[in-house]
Each structure stands twice: as C-alpha cells, then as structure tokens.
Amino acid sequence: MRKFYTSESVSEGHPDKLADFISDSILDEFLRQEPTSRVAVETLVTTGMAVVAGEVRAITAHVDVQKTVRDAVMKVGYTRANYGFDAEYSAVLVSIHEQSPEIAEGVDHSEEWRGMSEAERALPENAYSLVGAGDQGLMFGYATDETPELMPLPISLAHQLTRRLAELRKNGTLPYLRPDAKAQVTVVRDGDVHDASETLVDTIVISTQHGEDVTQEQIRQDMLKHVIQAVIPAEYLTPDTKYFINPSGRFVIGGPHGDTGLTGRKIIVDTYGGAVPHGGGAFSGKDPTKVDRSAAYYARYIAKNIVAAGLARRALVEVAYAIGRAHPVSLRVDTYGTGTVSDERLAQLVEAHFDARPQAIIAQLDLQRPIYAQTAAYGHFGRPEFPWEQTDRAEALRQAAQG
C-alpha cells in the first residue's frame, strides 16, 4: 500500500522564524557575555513593531536588547521601510524581568542535591547532580538511515529548498525574491519502508514573497530551474510529480507585515517534520538549563549514535523530566522493529553510555556558548556544525551491544 509523508520548511524571513532568530540572538548575546546566564525570551513581530518579553538571570551581562533586535532583523533582510517591517524604523518594545527565584532555586540545587550529605555530594557520580531540570516535560530525539545526515527525507528536502531560496535572494541571482518563503515536500513510499532508494517525490509546494514587478510565470520558471531542479535529485522526480508554485497567487506583502510572528510556533519545522512525536516544547530563546531544548538535542545525539552504530535503521528516544530534579523520570527507545538488539537492551546501553542529567548534557555538548542564533532557521538537526550531531559514541555502543 502506498503511503504519503509530508514535511514543510520555512525561510529565515518567515515571521515566526524571524521571532525565533531574534530570541536566539538575544540568548547568544547573554551567553557571550556570561555563559551561565539563565534566559527565557519570547518575541512577537508584527507591522512596524517587535515586542520582546521574558525572564533573565544574569549577574555581569548587560545586553543592549534594542540593538540586538535591530541587528537580527537586518541580518535576515528586512532593510526597507516599504516592507512594513524593517530594522531601522520599526519600534522595539522590551519587557524583560528577573527569573523567578523559586524556579532559580530548583535549577541551582536539584531535589537530589538538597537531599544529599556533604560526603555524598563529593562523590564523583554526583558531580552532575547539582543542577535540576528547568521544567517538567517530555522530549524526543530521532534518527533514520534514509539520508546521509540521518534525518527523514521529506524534511531534509524541504530545508534544502528554503535554504536555496535564501541563497538566490542574497547572492542576487533572483533579485525579486523577498525574505519570507515556505516549502513543502510530499514523498510516496510502499508501506512503511523508510528507504530513500524506494521513495519518489509526489508533490512540491513553494510559496515565496516577491517584488512588485515580476510575473507569476517567471517565478514558476525560476523556481523549477534554479530551486527545485538544483536541489531535488532527479531520481526522486517523475513526470507525475506535482508542482504548486505560489498557488495563492501574488505574494508581495509578507513577513511580519503580512502575518504576526511569534517565537516557538514552528516546532515541527525545527525538528523532524512530523515524522515522529513531539513533546510540545519550543527551543528558541531558552538557555540550556531548559530541558525543552537541551534534552531534545541530547535525545537526538543518542538516537543518531544508535543508528550510526548500526544497531537500528530508525531510532526514537524519549526522555522525560520533573522540574527541579536532575535525573530523568523516564527514558524509552523505540526502533520500530529495525533494531539488531531489543529496544529494552538498547535502553540499558543508553543508560550505561549516556548521562541525561541537565548539567551533564551541558558539559558533554558544551552548550553554554553563543551557538543558538544559527539554529533558528532550517532545522536544529541534521547539520554537522552542531555538537549534538556527533557520532563519537557509536563505536562504544556497537562494541557494548556485541558483548
């Protein structure tokens, strides 16, 4: 039976992604000045205005939030007042206050740590038990061997399309392009086979903001030639592949002037494109003590090492936390029947080879650095520049599974 799988991506100029980029740019500036800063910042962008609100705890950092916002908007490409939103003239309203002392205490000193004697605290196994999770919740990480980066094919292709649109806009190849854009890819497969070699692209949708003077026919021709054919491997395309290019027609009004944007509204774009469950927590604007972000990264790290080790073709890792506690309350591995050992055995291996306490995650992946603005568009996963994409524990896992 044929099955269809669809994922979408949005460009850095999409209003929700712009909001994510602003929030992560502010986070990065705090971490640049003070790596232990606690940050939870949300952004709203709309016609002529950006609003930044949230909670921060920092002792030495003094961030010029207004300047950081305007610099972020400039980088994305909203540089003209006639866009209805721009870096120079749009208002920037800031309402940032101190992190709740009750939350801070639960993170600073975990429930486990508070219950230990001084002698217990000095034990090596408790070195990473000081910091508690910044919230409760469940997080998922996933990897699949259907692409070289171990990501689902539909979201991988969708991100490549939006990246290509941004490239053509910035290098001047298609000067009529504007920052706001979306792409969507539907693939078709036989049954539950997750194999790129047995996959075809059924439908591609591209909606891109554009200037006043270009025709829709010109846009269609350029999207087919310079974007789709340049990105999608020919073996995935057939004479029956459907292309919907700006299917709503004219798309001159875009970005925050066309739609209000908010931090955290593209969580499926940020992760696996709907291929697996999502715990619901957004990433952007949050420092790594927030397990919504850091534990999702770590779960991807675990899943990717499982697949890279050849222990499964697909791996889903679920981890859950209680606020103020260091140790996860649960950890689950699901390989969808593709594992070379049982899922229960894999979970045991994960617990032996990975430490999912928040402080341990931060140390292992070196997360208290200004690396987050670059995550805000085109997905947080499948990109080798990020530390959670390493497969440095694959060999140890493989050997342990054979023992």
Swiss-Prot record:
CDD domains: S-AdoMet_synt. K(+) binds at residue 42. It is found in: Cytoplasm. It is an enzyme of class 2 (transferase). One of its GO terms (biological process) is S-adenosylmethionine biosynthetic process. L-methionine binds at residues 55, 99, 259, 290. One of its GO terms (molecular function) is methionine adenosyltransferase activity. Binds 2 divalent ions per subunit. Binds 1 potassium ion per subunit. Its cofactor is Mg(2+); K(+). Pfam families: S-AdoMet_synt_C (PF02773), S-AdoMet_synt_M (PF02772), S-AdoMet_synt_N (PF00438). The keyword Nucleotide-binding applies. InterPro entries: ADOMET_SYNTHASE_CS (IPR022631), S-AdoMet_synt_C (IPR022630), S-AdoMet_synt_central (IPR022629), S-AdoMet_synt_N (IPR022628), S-AdoMet_synthetase (IPR002133), S-AdoMet_synthetase_sfam (IPR022636). It catalyses: L-methionine + ATP + H2O = S-adenosyl-L-methionine + phosphate + diphosphate. Residues 99-109 are annotated as: Flexible loop. Its EC number is 2.5.1.6. ATP binds at residues 14, 180-182, 250-251, 259, 265-266, 282, 286. NCBIfam families: metK. Catalyzes the formation of S-adenosylmethionine (AdoMet) from methionine and ATP. The overall synthetic reaction is composed of two sequential steps, AdoMet formation and the subsequent tripolyphosphate hydrolysis which occurs prior to release of AdoMet from the enzyme. This is S-adenosylmethionine synthase.
